[in-house]
């Protein structure tokens, strides 16, 4: 009885159960079901991470390529095939298809062609803006001025020329000269005829004016 006070059954149970009541061995050991769940979660996380990285990489390449052109293919001039130029200019193959030098030349040729088309459609001006004379008009102007000068000049008249005989005292023979007569006045203008009409025919010479 004396020892029962110190060693009661309740104290004995609590003394023996306290070191083992707080320990759960099942939680520390992984069962097959818990191991499968953990492996599935790891697979899903890894696959999601790889998909995210791949999508971000593709989006990054698209954003970078949209601003400065395709990174793998360098831009080339459509005319001289150069890849380095301070400025890309518009050309016949589209925007930014020519280098700076070729673009300037192309622009000059385009302006020159448009100026030539405008001058051709207008018909009265050249590329420099200077009016050109019509060939037919200039020819008519030249012809009319010459005719006006000919009609006003006393040396230009319409003549009728015919062969007439005249006597040469030096050779004692008759020769033929051109008898030039003005149509309007019917006056002989040949200086030889002024004295030819006053020469008397010699009896020793026979001539026929009807021939």
UniProtKB/Swiss-Prot annotation:
GATA-type ZnF: 77-102
GO cellular-component term (any): nucleus
Quaternary organization: Forms heterodimers with GATA18.
Pfam families for this protein: GATA
Gene behind this protein: GATA19
Protein name per UniProt: GATA transcription factor 19
Origin superkingdom: Eukaryota
Keywords linked to the UniProt accession: DNA-binding, Metal-binding, Nucleus, Transcription, Transcription regulation, Zinc, Zinc-finger
Stretches of the chain forming a coiled coil according to its record: none
């Amino acid at each position: 009885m004396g020892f029962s006070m110190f060693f009661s059954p309740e104290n004995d149970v609590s003394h023996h159960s306290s070191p083992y009541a707080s320990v759960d061995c099942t939680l520390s050991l992984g069962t097959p079901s818990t191991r499968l769940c953990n492996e599935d979660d790891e697979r899903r996380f890894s696959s999601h991470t790889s998909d995210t990285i791949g999508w971000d990489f593709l989006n990054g390449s698209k954003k970078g390529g949209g601003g400065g052109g395709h990174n793998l293919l360098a831009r080339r001039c459509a005319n001289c095939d150069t890849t380095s130029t301070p400025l890309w200019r518009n050309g016949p193959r589209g925007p930014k298809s020519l280098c700076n030098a070729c673009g300037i030349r192309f622009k000059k040729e385009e302006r020159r062609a448009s100026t030539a088309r405008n001058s051709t459609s207008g018909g009265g001006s050249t590329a420099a803006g200077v009016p050109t004379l019509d060939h037919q008009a200039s020819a008519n102007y030249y012809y009319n001025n010459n005719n006006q000068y000919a009609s006003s000049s006393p040396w230009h008249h319409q003549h009728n020329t015919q062969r007439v005989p005249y006597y040469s005292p030096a050779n004692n023979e008759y020769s033929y000269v051109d008898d030039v007569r003005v149509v309007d006045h019917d006056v002989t203008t040949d200086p030889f005829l002024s004295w030819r009409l006053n020469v008397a025919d010699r009896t020793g010479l026979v001539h026929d004016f009807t021939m």
